[in-house]
Design a protein with these regions (language model features):
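Short catalytic-loop micro-motif centered on adjacent basic/acidic residues
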Residues: 67, 93-98
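RNase H-like two-metal-ion nuclease catalytic core shared by retroviral integrases
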Residues: 97-112, 118-142, 156-157
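Active-site beta-loop-alpha junctions of metal-dependent nucleic acid enzymes
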Residues: 49, 66-90
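Basic nucleic-acid-binding interfaces
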Residues: 94, 117-121, 152, 164, ...
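Charged, gly/pro-enriched flexible loop segments at helix/strand junctions
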Residues: 160-178
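Short, charged, surface-exposed loops that flank catalytic or proteolytic processing sites
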Residues: 146-161
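An active-site-proximal beta-strand-loop segment
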Residues: 33-65, 71
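Basic, flexible linker segments flanking DNA-binding modules
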Residues: 1-35, 109, 125
């Protein structure tokens, strides 16, 4: 892989550094619903075919949203985030994602258009996005593993069942240990 080069005024060739991304502050505390929304992807494979479940969770209120797709491109995630903005009853101020390519280009453009701050976690630190990772584990254990055949056979029916599960998850399911 070649990196772009830059020539200094002395004639020496220098490597051009990549554009830096805004990292999540270590002391970030959510103060109200919509302050920080965490996004992530769950990937399932079967017979060489991949399906993706795009997930979003508001860290303060623990309100969630998810949808299954065949692609996890930046354009797909931008459309997903647009749906999230329509579904969530409050204004989103900050988005927290990992460093995946699906969170670049189109999603970044949508976030900039809506004046939403986009924080990235540090590389190889899933603990910085622990709420979303925990939700991903929960949704896989409680829902996806039971309907994995439906996920690959009929995505529309899977998404209908998923919306019913998310309604249960957001309104009736107990989230905290006693």
């Amino acid at each position: 892989r070649t990196f772009p080069k830059k020539v200094s005024h002395f004639g020496k060739i220098k490597k051009v550094n990549r554009e830096k991304v805004l990292r999540k502050p270590k002391d970030l505390v959510t103060a109200y619903p919509g302050h920080v929304l965490a996004l992530d992807t769950v990937e399932k494979q079967r017979n060489g075919r991949r399906m993706y479940i795009l997930t979003a969770i508001d860290i303060f209120s623990r309100t969630t949203f998810a949808i299954a797709t065949r692609s996890h491109s930046s354009k797909t995630f931008a459309h997903f985030f647009y749906l999230v903005m329509q579904m969530f009853p409050y204004e989103i101020k900050t988005v927290l994602t990992d460093n995946g390519s699906e969170f670049k280009k189109c999603l970044d453009q949508l976030l900039k258009q809506n004046n939403i701050t986009h924080y990235h976690t540090y590389p190889k630190t899933p603990k910085m996005n622990a709420h979303c990772e925990s939700f991903n584990g929960t949704i896989q254990e409680e829902f996806v593993d039971y309907y994995v055949n439906l996920l690959f056979d009929d995505t529309t029916k899977f998404n209908e069942k998923l919306s019913q599960y998310l309604e249960f998850y957001n309104t009736k399911r107990v989230h905290y240990a006693f």
